[in-house]
């Protein structure tokens, strides 16, 4: 759980089921008003921070006060899945406070509220998605469950990218002879036979 005095959570770190969320975001789009059977007005707004975007559902009069470009701090919010999409809510006791306008670094991608067929499939079948495990083999860094594999998980940092010239960087791991190089393979789990042909 997150307390009111905790630093804001990034949108990329929001997961379904989290409560007492503190998030700072900029409003990118305000959806049209829909009315519930009880007579409440609901607006879905697309909001973002520097790590991505998400949809927030805002109820009643507060939704009418929000404008595109507003920078808002949500306190005591929660996240849930609605129609297979991750959605942020203010909830009971939650607050939206305008703290600025327009000047905030943000990214619209990834959109964490895009429909997630994996989640919908899990709900319908009640089983875990095994494809994530298959795709995460032979890779370094975070995998689907947040665990790390490879040298990074043992406290070594492997730089990725290019030095002066083509080819991958060959990092020197502690405890390995200097004449021996370690090749780092970065895989995006795509079949190389289906590569783009020019």
Curated annotation (Swiss-Prot):
Q: Which UniProt keywords apply?
A: DNA damage, DNA repair, DNA-binding, Nucleus
Q: Which cysteines are joined by disulfide bonds?
A: none
Q: Which residues bind DNA?
A: 26-89
Highest taxon, organism lineage: Eukaryota
Where does the UniProt entry say this protein principally localizes?
Answer: nucleus
Q: Which GO BP terms apply?
A: DNA damage response; DNA repair; double-strand break repair via homologous recombination; mitotic G2/M transition checkpoint; response to ionizing radiation
**Which residue stretches does the UniProt record annotate as biased composition, category Polar residues?**
136-151, 173-188
Q: Where is this region: Disordered?
A: 114-198
Which organs or tissues contain this protein? Ubiquitous with high expression in the thymus.
Q: What are the recorded GO MF terms, alphabetically?
A: RNA binding; single-stranded DNA binding
Which compartment or compartments is the protein found in?
Nucleus
Describe the task this protein carries out: Component of the SOSS complex, a multiprotein complex that functions downstream of the MRN complex to promote DNA repair and G2/M checkpoint. In the SOSS complex, acts as a sensor of single-stranded DNA that binds to single-stranded DNA, in particular to polypyrimidines. The SOSS complex associates with DNA lesions and influences diverse endpoints in the cellular DNA damage response including cell-cycle checkpoint activation, recombinational repair and maintenance of genomic stability.
Q: What is annotated about its quaternary structure and interactions? A: Component of the SOSS complex, composed of SOSS-B (SOSS-B1/NABP2 or SOSS-B2/NABP1), SOSS-A/INTS3 and SOSS-C/INIP. SOSS complexes containing SOSS-B1/NABP2 are more abundant than complexes containing SOSS-B2/NABP1.
Name of the protein this chain belongs to: SOSS complex subunit B2
Species per Swiss-Prot/TrEMBL record: Mus musculus
């Amino acid at each position: 759980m997150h307390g009111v005095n905790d630093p804001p959570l990034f949108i990329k770190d929001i997961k379904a089921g989290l409560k007492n969320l503190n998030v700072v975001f900029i409003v990118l789009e305000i959806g049209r008003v829909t009315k519930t059977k009880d007579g409440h007005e609901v607006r879905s707004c697309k909001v973002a921070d520097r790590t991505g975007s998400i949809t927030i559902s805002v109820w009643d009069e507060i939704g009418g006060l929000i404008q595109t470009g507003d920078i808002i701090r949500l306190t005591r919010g929660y996240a849930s899945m609605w129609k297979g999409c991750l959605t942020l809510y203010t909830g009971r006791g939650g607050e939206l406070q305008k703290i600025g306008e327009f000047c905030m670094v943000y990214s619209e991608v990834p959109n964490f509220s895009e429909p997630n067929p994996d989640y919908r499939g899990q709900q319908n079948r009640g089983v875990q998605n095994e494809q994530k495990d298959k795709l995460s083999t032979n890779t370094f860094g975070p995998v689907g469950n947040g665990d790390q594999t490879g040298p990074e998980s043992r406290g070594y940092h492997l730089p990725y990218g290019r030095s002066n010239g083509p080819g991958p960087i060959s990092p020197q791991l502690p405890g390995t002879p200097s004449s021996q190089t370690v090749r780092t393979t970065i895989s995006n789990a795509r079949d190389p036979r289906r590569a783009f042909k020019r």
